[in-house]
């Protein structure tokens, strides 16, 4: 069964790839809508979650009801933490794999995000008609925004401005421990402790928490309460003037106000704090006349700070759709034209230069990338209405070795269900959780590096190293580990090498370098002034510098060649973990490249290098390649055959 409700905004054009499915899945109901164009949300329907065994069944029922046979892109806001592929709902019995659900429904993209993360993304677009201010002054533009809301659970999120966009915070703040502020709330806590080993704000401040408060106050007054009383009935009684229900609502709103004030202080939410969820909205004037605002401001020395922060009650009917639509649009924009997916950008840039037949393959890749990834070449050719050789020519036009190589690169560009973002490790994570996050973050950074690494710069660096008279590796602090590793690899090539992790030794040695010498400088920040001065001295004497660092740093700008390794771990206060792995990988790439060059180069080399190369036979150089674990020497192959 579903309740039909439709909402349609002003038409702003149609999505070229067809309507997008939007969903807002709560503990009780699942709401679905179609977005046929930017801002055009229609066919909103609500389905009780208990009526459907799985989320896939609910989605199929909706698509059948609205007579839509094909959806390419979908996004779901769900009342649950989302961390990885498997989602198991806390307040409902649905459990599903995001990727398996995407495949089962035939979507190209399926995003699943926390519902309050989605709601947070809707806040900047709310109009005055979609919110009611409850106290406070004027919100500060381009400042942090707080969000919380009681529904089946207590959602908490925030919105942080970053240049011309917003970043939503994923949070489970509703599970913070409840802290009573008066004797009445002490009674509520004591009552709740009899039922729950840990009493969080969600236990007393979400929808079901109103029943806890009601029963606690009834026990205080020695009143008998029906076994079936629920939040809806309590709110109805309060509107009818029932004294116990009114006190329950007042206590509930006071606790919510105190919690909202804590959220505002924690986030520094000068852009305002918004209250979403269904409970506060149903309270109506009972909420606006309650002690919510007074308790929001009651923070002792910081009362004046909070007096100026406005609080808003969200009145928009389906605000989560606006937020999840914005998140999906940003992901698809990144895929087709953003910096996070180089392969899609390359297709767009080269499209006009392709033949008409190759353009059809390009359009298939842009609009239906999953089809390219999953289908065999015969099906790809059929869908694009081209020959199979045309598919191969298209892949090679993009610089790929063939279809398999193109599929791999295309898959890494799909951010819809492949984890390409940084997952935070939290206190209390199990070894399984934090171990998976550390590995996923590292893998994500490596895939990003592969997509964005300038291989022309890599070739130039290998050329410089292969012709070097002497190579010195400089790294300070944690980067010295990378420098030492590089020294151990490169000394096997017969080139004089050394690694220095001390500034005084670097300065003394750099003063002796000249033409034909190379320094490989490894630095996460690329800003150490002492290191930069040392490199300036060496470069003025004719030495070349290869920098392994972050983009747009002073080191990257000074170096002869810069190999840039950007990633999420960018704060100076952080110990280099991911950056160390990326820097070590860059050394591996350079070492393998030099090993291959020295095994195959027949051109002229500097005299000292030529003599060293003469002392190392091709077999010995191949042994070095095998030693680097990226090749197999003839001897190793013989052993394998034996």
From Swiss-Prot:
Keywords: ATP-binding, DNA-binding, Glycolysis, Kinase, Membrane, Multifunctional enzyme, Nucleotide-binding, Transcription, Transcription regulation, Transferase, Transmembrane, Transmembrane helix
GO biological process, one term: glycolytic process
EC number(s) reported in the record: 2.7.1.2
Transmembrane regions listed in the UniProt entry: 576-596
Gene Ontology molecular function: any one: DNA-binding transcription factor activity
Assigned GO CC terms: cytosol; membrane
Region (Glucokinase): 1-340
Name of protein: Bifunctional protein glk
């Amino acid at each position: 069964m579903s309740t039909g409700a439709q909402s349609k905004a002003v038409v702003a054009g149609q999505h070229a790839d067809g309507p997008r499915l939007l969903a807002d899945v709560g503990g009780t109901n699942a709401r679905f809508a179609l977005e046929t164009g930017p801002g055009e949300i229609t066919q909103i329907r609500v389905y009780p979650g208990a009526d459907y065994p799985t989320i896939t069944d609910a989605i199929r029922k909706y698509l059948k009801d609205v007579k839509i046979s094909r959806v390419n892109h979908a996004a779901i806001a769900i009342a649950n933490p989302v961390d990885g592929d498997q989602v198991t709902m806390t307040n409902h019995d649905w459990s599903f794999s995001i990727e398996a659900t995407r495949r089962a429904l035939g979507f190209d993209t399926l995003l699943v995000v926390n519902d309050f993360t989605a709601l947070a993304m809707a806040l900047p677009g709310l109009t005055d008609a979609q919110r009611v201010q409850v106290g406070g002054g004027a919100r500060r533009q381009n400042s942090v925004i707080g969000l919380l809301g009681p529904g089946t659970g207590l959602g908490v999120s925030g919105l942080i401005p970053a240049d011309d966009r917003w970043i939503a915070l994923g949070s489970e703040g509703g599970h913070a421990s409840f802290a009573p502020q008066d004797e009445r709330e002490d009674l509520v806590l004591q009552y709740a402790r009899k039922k729950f080993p840990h009493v969080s704000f969600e236990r007393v401040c979400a929808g079901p928490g109103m029943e806890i408060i009601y029963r606690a106050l009834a026990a205080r007054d020695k009143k008998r309460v029906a076994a079936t009383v629920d939040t809806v009935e309590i709110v109805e009684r309060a509107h009818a003037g029932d004294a116990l229900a009114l006190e329950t609502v007042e206590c509930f709103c006071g606790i919510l106000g105190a919690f909202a004030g804590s959220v505002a202080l924690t986030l520094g939410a000068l852009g305002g704090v918004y209250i979403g969820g269904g409970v506060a909205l149903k309270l109506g004037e009972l909420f606006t006349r309650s002690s919510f605002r007074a308790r929001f401001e009651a923070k002792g020395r910081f009362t004046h700070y909070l007096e100026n922060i406005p609080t808003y009650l969200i009145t928009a009917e389906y605000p989560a759709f606006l937020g999840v639509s914005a998140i999906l649009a940003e992901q698809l924009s990144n895929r087709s034209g953003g910096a996070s997916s180089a392969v899609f950008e390359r297709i767009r840039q080269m499209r006009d230069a392709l033949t008409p037949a190759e353009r059809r393959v390009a359009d298939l890749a842009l609009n239906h990338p999953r089809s390219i990834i999953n289908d065999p070449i015969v099906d790809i050719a059929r869908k694009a209405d081209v020959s199979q050789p045309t598919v191969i020519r298209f892949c090679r036009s993009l610089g790929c070795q063939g279809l398999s190589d193109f599929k791999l690169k295309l898959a890494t560009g799909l951010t819809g269900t492949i984890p390409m973002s940084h997952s935070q490790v939290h206190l209390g994570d199990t070894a399984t959780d934090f171990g998976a996050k550390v590995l996923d973050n590292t893998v994500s950074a490596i895939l990003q590096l592969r997509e964005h690494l300038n291989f022309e710069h890599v070739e130039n660096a290998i050329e410089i190293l292969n012709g070097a008279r002497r190579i010195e590796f400089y790294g300070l602090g944690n980067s010295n580990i990378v420098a030492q590793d590089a020294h151990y690899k490169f000394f096997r090539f017969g080139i004089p090498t050394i690694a220095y992790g001390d500034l005084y030794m670097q300065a003394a040695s750099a003063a002796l370098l000249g033409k034909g010498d190379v320094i490989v400088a490894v630095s996460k920040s690329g800003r150490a002034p002492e290191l930069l001065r040392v490199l300036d001295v060496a470069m003025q004497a004719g030495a070349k510098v290869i920098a392994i660092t972050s983009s747009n740093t002073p080191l990257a700008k000074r170096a002869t060649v810069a190999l840039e390794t950007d990633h999420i771990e960018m704060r100076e206060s952080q110990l280099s973990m991911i950056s160390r792995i990326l820097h070590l990988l860059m050394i591996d790439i350079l070492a393998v490249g030099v090993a291959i060059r020295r095994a195959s180069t027949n051109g002229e080399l500097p005299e000292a290098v030529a003599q060293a190369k003469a002392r190392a036979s091709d077999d010995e150089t191949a042994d070095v390649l095998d030693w680097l674990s990226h090749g197999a020497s003839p001897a190793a192959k013989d052993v394998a055959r034996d």
